[in-house]
Amino acid sequence: MSQSGSVLRRNGFTFKQFFVAHDRCAMKVGTDGILLGAWAPVADVKRILDIGTGSGLLALMLAQRTDDNVPIDAVELDAGAAMQAQENVAHSPWPHRITVHTDDIQSWAPRQTVRFDLIISNPPYYEPGVECATPQREQARYTATLDHQTLLAIAADCITEDGFFCVVLPEQIGNAFTQQALNMGWHLRLRTDVAENEARLPHRVLLAFSPQAGECFSDRLVIRGSDQHYSESYTALTQAFYLFM
């Protein structure tokens, strides 16, 4: 049985340590989220914020990667997705660490009295245009409810002085997002350009920004080798999560 056929069941995705149901979420578990959750720097992290958690995928991946005393706040605007995220968390090994908030990040963030040293988001990136099949999918895919400038401003208000704000975006949109972040005082510290294989140009980019200036480390990740199997670098990054890797 293929990997995709053996890990997809009951409208969800089974990882080594947890299961993510996503049938009530506009955006399903996919490579973008898995890449971001496996890639984000977690050294010395003390508190995590997941903006737009959806099914709870990123919060769960980061719970697996961090110490048991690290709390994670996961904020989701869509009530159906937030409820499913709560269920996924409840059935995971970390229900005591992850709190799912059904709220708009723009109203939730100003009420917080603590700051986060890791903020993570798989944000919407399409400009409003062609309508989606459902309002929930439109909300998840389009920037009308949370544009990038607002997202960057919220992250700036919530982050510690030496924290990281991490996102995954399509390559060209990521370049524009980076320029916007730099204009707002952020510093780009990590960048990984992601290509499907060696013959193709990068189609996604993983970005980590910080309020603190410092050297920017950049590299390239290829998902599949010439034999169409996962590359060594992609395997090393994600093997703690995929069942059959």
UniProtKB/Swiss-Prot annotation:
User: Which HAMAP family does the record cross-reference, listed alphabetically?
Assistant: tRNA_methyltr_YfiC (MF_01872)
Q: Which PANTHER family match?
A: TRNA1(VAL) (ADENINE(37)-N6)-METHYLTRANSFERASE
Membrane-crossing residues? none
Say which species the protein is native to. Salmonella enteritidis PT4 (strain P125109)
Q: Which PROSITE patterns does this one have? A: N6_MTASE
Q: Which InterPro entries match?
A: DNA_methylase_N6_adenine_CS, SAM-dependent_MTases_sf, Small_mtfrase_dom, tRNA_Adenine-N(6)_MTase, tRNA_adenine-N6_MeTrfase
The organism's superkingdom is given as Bacteria
Keyword Metal-binding carried by entry? no
Q: Where in the cell is it found?
A: Cytoplasm
Q: Name one GO biological process term.
A: tRNA processing
Q: Name one GO cellular component term.
A: cytoplasm
**What name does this protein carry?**
tRNA1(Val) (adenine(37)-N6)-methyltransferase
Catalytic function, reaction form: adenosine(37) in tRNA1(Val) + S-adenosyl-L-methionine = N(6)-methyladenosine(37) in tRNA1(Val) + S-adenosyl-L-homocysteine + H(+)
Record-level Gene Ontology MF annotations = nucleic acid binding; tRNA (adenine-N6)-methyltransferase activity
Where does the UniProt entry say this protein principally localizes? cytoplasm
